[in-house]
């Protein structure tokens, strides 16, 4: 290979490397598996230009296969009016008739992914060399990043990733086993610096300067799962003001594999094939969006949903300016689309109740430390850093009792870990099964029948039921049974400020009910590595229980209320907040800390419990339609949904956020009584009460962005499940402890959602449409926020979501280019 001194023409390679790394979306670990926009690195491009980029790099863009759209036209989901409007929006000169004629013509050209050198080898002998390279890198990454799953740890994990790989390659004999010679020697000749190695690799491969960016992006996407994990490590480091070079090092490893294969390849035909592939890419032509049939059809699909949504909103009752009488109760749920159904059901069984929508962390930016642990878990949107650390503690206990129970839990966890290590060790694998296998027969039978949980819930491991019932978050500093260098709790001087933030952004500043429920949400499943993806995204993939309970504790705190009153927020003395958890698998709501309520509110609590039970039944019956039990009696539906929480063979315990398509920030009266089919994120917002529009700014920069991430994660998982989804859930195997999953026993780390989260085996349950954001607020204020925040501006101006404004009279306007807002008819 050439020496660094000879690569003067690659002196600006650092910018290319950084550009490729920025294109990769982070992948959060399984312990808080939150949805991420897989195209977040392309948001600086208009949506349909990003489609062109992806088709050039991966061979697959941002649309579904043509037959999908043909089916939507055939069943009436896309109508003539939608096609007409789509052609206008895409600036196409075709008529609908011409479009349908072109639809019948299959393109003669095929989108070919941007090649890596292993593709040239595959083209020559049809052996899966690209798969071999991915397998070698994936196994290396699993060992290097392992978080405790491996019995033996890699010896070079303390070295930078690229330098550790150089040492690993010295011992890796697998290339020789598949007939590759000289790999180890070529790897040994690589430079020690990752950036220098990348430059040398590009020189070795003769990648033209104008293709460097595309090649580096393609190289990272060829190992996209592990690239996402490395991007996550960088993301976490940046939140702390630090740096992490794992992604750059992974890129160096990937391109060096290509360079090594090229250097050791003696076949002239393969080298010629490689240069031909590069030449083809340089002369490649991509369809314009106006001529891209599937882009027009995708736009028509989205217009069809907008037509239905806007019609429903226009037909809804208008918000009233009259003073609302005191509600019989108030219940705040997360903005999650699953909350839309239970909120609608609760308002049906109790018309006098007021429901609210707010992000499920309930405004408390914290990390939460489980009892007996010193490892905090984020309970806030992943785009924020937690200013507070709150500990779970044993209620009504002395310090000595707390320490005893914490020590007992720690001992149980250590014993469980040691027992698991013994069962999986090399010396006991066979003898253990032979000696004790029969003892596990009752549990195996119970687990198989779905009568028992296969394993305890992670939050309950090492705890007996009595201790579990006594655990709760503490507002004040707590030892939690463990020492901590970081102060815990929320300082008393800051509580009124936090309370004000919660109430104002929830839209709850007057007319307080006697009883106010803050209901977080979570899911209950077993044998589901990606189970945290069903929990609350606003709580970083945790349940909303801790967030709801700490918010309630704070809002009931007398000192906090005195501080709130000084800020002009007077909560009546007979108003009490109470925390709950909505189980989205069973639609049952558990209420916590009821012993804190005075006896004067016993009837209020009993009535609320009954309303929640009735609403849960209505919600289950509505959801049963998609779960195949719609014709069953209510008690049968309930039993089936409870079974799903324990059944280790259930691949579709619930549909989670499948179908999500809209984000609405408006007074509840705007959507109350409207069946939004569990497809809309609902955030309560009244701009008339938002002095300075700080709440509007928060909504557009946080919940709206998070909803876009969720929406795009589902979108990407459906239109390109191979790269941005996780394949078949049945084949998932956990790797690295809690890093992620492989499909089967090898290949790349998988990202996104499994097919079972999108498809019921017969038809698609999710519909790939970009998020439709509807906000009831002045256009000028929204434009001001768009202009101040580049992230929001990129999402809106580049078409990664649709933005609509709804006026006080119910008129709807769509935001288009040049800051124009034409009225929707």
From Swiss-Prot:
Zn(2+) binds at residues 334, 336, 521, 536. It is found in: Cell inner membrane. Its cofactor is Zn(2+). GO terms for molecular function: zinc ion binding. It is a peripheral membrane protein. Belongs to the inorganic carbon transporter (TC 9.A.2) DabA family. GO terms for cellular component: plasma membrane. The keyword Lipid metabolism does not apply. Part of an energy-coupled inorganic carbon pump. Keywords: Cell inner membrane, Cell membrane, Membrane, Metal-binding, Transport, Zinc. Signal peptide: none annotated. It comes from the Bacteria. The lineage of its organism: Bacteria, Pseudomonadati, Pseudomonadota, Acidithiobacillia, Acidithiobacillales. Forms a complex with DabB. This is Probable inorganic carbon transporter subunit DabA. It comes from Acidithiobacillus ferrooxidans (strain ATCC 23270 / DSM 14882 / CIP 104768 / NCIMB 8455). InterPro entries: DabA. It holds the Pfam family DabA. PANTHER family: INORGANIC CARBON TRANSPORTER SUBUNIT DABA-RELATED, UPF0753 PROTEIN AQ_863.
